[in-house]
A protein has these predicted regions:
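Basic, glycine/lysine-rich polyanion-binding surfaces/domains
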Residues: 1-133
């Protein structure tokens, strides 16, 4: 069996971890922190985010005042704030639009795109390896 055939078989029958190159999976990550982060973010995106527990998440969008989509994103709640997972190309515009609405709020936005790598665990045994029921 060739190396490629063995990798395909392992993925099909068990699980395999893939490193996702930036060019293959261009995702961006924005960190939202501060004592007002939950309330502020809840008013900025289309889904209810303030009720999210750490480790939870939801799909949402950032809209213009006229209702046009600026970016679609996944909001991931953390103990100390939120992560906004979106397309890498959307991050500069997302940051620019969000920053204009931080007036007297204790909110800090940080582009964390370059700080993390992306991996994908694939195969029928993936969830059991992660301890997910």
């Amino acid at each position: 069996m060739t190396d490629l055939a063995a990798e395909v078989e392992a993925t099909r029958c068990q699980a395999r971890l893939f490193a996702l190159a930036e060019r293959d999976h261009a995702r961006g990550l924005v960190e939202v922190r501060g004592s007002d982060a939950g309330r502020w973010l809840d008013g900025m995106v289309t889904n209810e985010t303030i009720a999210l527990s750490p480790g939870g998440g939801c799909y949402a969008a950032l809209l213009t005042p006229k209702g046009r989509i600026v970016a679609d994103l996944h909001v991931l709640a953390r103990e100390d704030g939120y992560w906004l997972d979106t397309s890498a190309w959307a991050v500069p515009n997302l940051l620019q639009r969000l920053e204009r609405y931080i007036v007297a709020d204790d909110v800090k936005l940080t582009d964390r795109t370059a700080d993390f790598g992306r991996f994908s665990l694939e195969g029928p045994e993936a969830t059991s390896l992660l301890g997910v029921p």
